[in-house]
Structure formats: structure tokens, C-alpha cells
Amino acid sequence: MAQIEQSSDQGMMVEDHLFYLPATMTERWNYTEHRLGTVTATYDDCPDFTWQITPSDSELISLSDIRLELEVHLTRADGTPLQTEDCVSSVNNLLHSLFQSVSVELGGRSISDRSNLYFLRAYSENLIGFCTDAQKSQLTSAGFIIDNNYTAPYNGVFIPAVQGGTKARVTFNSSGAHQRAEMINQIYPLQLRGRIHSDIFQQEKPLLTGVPVFIRLTRARTALSFTAVDSAHLPKIAIRNPRLLIRKFEMTPAYSNAWAKQLMTRKCYASY
């Protein structure tokens, strides 16, 4: 019944299949994509973001294909644009470093880890769970830039003299930090996209019909996500247009019949 995608005829793979291949695609029929906004109002200092995926009677949700998209607007604390001498840079894996925890509920029951170490889990999984090619291409959309050591004198920028002193050099501790600083100075706003690092979104099982999904991401402190020449120059962060990319699909007749045949003889248990 199942046909491995790798053994199929050659063709152009979709974006999310460049570094991830589902075991089988035979259960999918007539899939659609949706972008969902938050269920609550958002503002620049919003402490958390909440989404609710309403249940469907006929479509399954592809859990491994759910993606988070958002825009990051950075300014000085007084609202003026950032300057080069502020030496603002982000930590690695910026998209996920903006949040300290993720909460996922299925049918009103929490199934996620309640710890406030979401950013550490996301960084660890991106660092050891993907090949170097993926880290240099696909993961850059989430602000992941590999850190390498820099050697003087190419590792800093001069800032103006303060109170009659001489110019000072501010150094970045890695080439990745320098590249992220250049990205912040050249791109406004920063558009980031990536997967949500939670157990339920790391499996090939689709979500059964009739089950509502509730997702909440809680913001982290600015000092956890960004560095600057000093604490007074840390940027003001505004997260705007947060969206979830959802892929739904209808079951093929063969896949649906296989389920129905099993349900005739035994109970169906779905674990996530």
C-alpha cells in the first residue's frame, strides 16, 4: 500500500522536503494550506501569542508541516532607528530565542513541556539535528547562522568617543554574531520562519479529525535574544504579523478504507 517517496519518479521537491522526507505520501489527497492569525489581539509589547486550529470533519492536519511566521521590528528604546554604533546583534537561532516556552493543548488537554527552556531545546535540535547544508540554507530563515571564531582586527566596529574619551572598539565574539548584526542593519523588518520545536510537531502522524489544537508561545526577555554595546542600547522588540502555516489534506480512498477496516475489528488508539 505504502510507497516510499524516494523510490517515486524524479520531480521537483517542495521546500519543506529538501531536508525532510516523509516516509510515505500515499495518505494525502487534495491538500490545502492556510495561514492563521492569533485568536487574541496583539500589540508591540504583547507577552504571548495564541492560536487555535479549529477541528475539521473531513481534513487531517499534517503536524510536521506546521510553521511559524512573523516579522521583527527593532528600534532604540526611544523609538528611533538603530545605529551602527549601537552594535546590536542577535543570538543564534533568533526566531526561537524570542520565546521562552510553548504550550500545546489537544482537545483541552495539555501535552507539552511546561519548562521555560524552549529556546535551548530549539537551538540544540537545530544544531545537532540538521546537516551543515540545511543549517546554511533552510535554517537561515529562522535566524540560524553558524558561529565561528573571528581574529582581530576584523572583529569589531568603532564607536564614537564618549565624554572626551578616545574611540573604542566593540568586538563580536564570532563571525555569526557579526553577520547577524549586518543583517539587522540592512533588513527591516526581519521576516523569520521556522518549525515549532515541540514533540507533537516532530512526527509524521497526522492529527485526527474533530480534535481542536491550542498553541501558545510566551515571549522571552530582550536580554536573552539580543546583545548591544551596553544594556542601555538593547533594542526595543516588536513582533508583528505572527502567523501559523497549516497544511490540511483529505485522506485517499485506500488510506481511509484501511482505517475503516481496522476499526471494524479493533479499537483505534492515537498517541502524540
What are these regions (language model features)?
Residues 1-272:
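Short, low-complexity Pro/Thr/Gly
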